[in-house]
């Protein structure tokens, strides 16, 4: 499988984007099948995620995506963002903050907006990025989540 990739740019050009939005991902569908598959992986079978009939009685009125499902979608969304020329691999280094602001109802579309907050050299051949990320829900004013995401890139 070939993963989609965003623009590749020289490191100096990427570093010049600190404090700026580097991109917005495409929309991703949140289907009941996606939610059920995630529930199977995590063993989180709470009815608000997997039981459409019972979820109608919840404050959400329907099933909702797991917060961690929404967060995990960042792995797909980041592939659409610009990358640094010469990077051989990148790894998720964790999060400083994550807030689940709004529920993501089944049938919604979500996308991520990425702002490069910082980039620093850890050692020769390794940099750390900090992205301020907002996952938006199509048609909603409040985001699904906001996070400070750390990544390591290796040259």
Model regions: which residues?
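Predominant activation on well-ordered alpha-helical scaffold segments within soluble catalytic domains
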Residues: 36-39, 71-75
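Generic structural detector for well-ordered beta-strands
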Residues: 23, 27-29, 99, 150-152
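Hydrophobic beta-strand-centered segment that forms part of the acyl-chain substrate-binding groove
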Residues: 58-62, 72-113
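Catalytic strand-loop segment that frames the active site of acyl-thioester-processing enzymes
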Residues: 2-65
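HotDog/MaoC-like acyl-thioester-processing domains
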Residues: 1-16, 103-155
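A solvent-exposed, acidic/Ser-Thr-rich amphipathic alpha-helical stretch
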Residues: 66-70
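A generic structural signal for short beta-strands and their flanking turns/coil linkers
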Residues: 24-26, 34, 87-96, 110, ...
């Amino acid at each position: 499988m070939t993963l989609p990739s965003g623009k590749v740019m020289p490191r100096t050009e990427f570093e010049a984007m600190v404090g700026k939005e580097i991109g917005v991902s495409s929309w991703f569908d949140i289907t009941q099948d996606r939610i059920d598959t995630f529930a199977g992986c995590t063993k989180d079978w709470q009815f608000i995620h997997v039981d459409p009939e019972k979820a109608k009685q919840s404050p959400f009125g329907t099933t909702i995506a797991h917060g961690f499902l929404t967060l995990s979608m960042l792995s797909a969304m980041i592939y659409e963002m610009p990358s640094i020329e010469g990077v051989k691999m990148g790894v998720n280094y964790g999060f400083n903050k994550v807030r689940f602001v709004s529920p993501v109802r089944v049938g919604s579309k979500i996308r991520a907006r990425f702002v490069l907050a910082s980039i620093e050299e850890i050692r020769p051949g390794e940099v750390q990025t900090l992205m301020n990320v907002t996952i938006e829900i199509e048609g909603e004013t409040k985001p699904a989540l906001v996070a400070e995401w750390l990544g390591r890139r290796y040259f």
